[in-house]
Amino acid sequence: RNNRVCFHNIKYMKNFLLSIVIFLLSSFKSLGHVDHYANFNYLEYELFRNDKLIGYHKYDFKRSGQDLSVVSEVSFNIRKLGVDLYKYFAKSEENYTKGVFQSYSSKTKQNKKNKYVNINIDQNNNNLIIDGSSYKGTTSNKFIVGTWWNHEIVKAKAQISGISGRIIEQTVTFIGKEEVKIGNKTYKTLHFNFKSSDNSLPESKKLNTDIWYEEETYLWVKAAFDKTGYWENRIKKGN
């Protein structure tokens, strides 16, 4: 009987490992471009802090021939007793040609502090040229701007802050497949955790965010992180 149990456990582990390999191959075979977002025109998310609605995050997908521009707007306001404690507003534009990244620009206002970043391609070596409020210089074109709508970010060794241009080295862990219910709709999702690879960073600078993508479409469904409160982005509508 013990031999049968042992054999069953070994067979189970082999099947489990095989399923993980199949998942990785099927999930990431198309990660090179953003062509699989061809059917998306508009995405809108509600932003919650401690389960209280405080703002929104919107994406407009604008196409012209082989060019795609993704225009984003984020706004939220934390208030207490009728007083504004924290106000945030950001606008950005991300540009692609034939599904390949070309440029990114954003302006952000955090209370009275202004931040910005402009990212372009170096035509000599295809590296990224960053001009931001936190970083100015060049970096690898394998790094990706930290706009969560694009699931390519799961395979990047580092992301670039879409607010200030800061380069954030990351470790991405696949947590598992999960069903996520938002409103009256249930999504079959792939759950990932993103953490800063550099443990020497101060806590305020460390990345530790959970992201859920719809399994079939790679639609960004939800984000969550815990920093001065529990924050969530939940999808509201998309077409």
Predicted regions and their residues:
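Bacterial N-terminal signal peptides that target proteins for export
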Residues: N9-L17
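Acidic/charged, solvent-exposed loop-and-adjacent secondary-structure segments enriched in E/D, K/R, S/T
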Residues: L128-F143
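Acidic, serine/threonine-rich low-complexity disordered tracts
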Residues: L31-Q123, E152-N239
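Sec-dependent N-terminal signal peptides
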Residues: F16-L25
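Beta-strand/loop-rich accessory regions of lumenal/periplasmic or secreted enzymes
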Residues: S140-V154
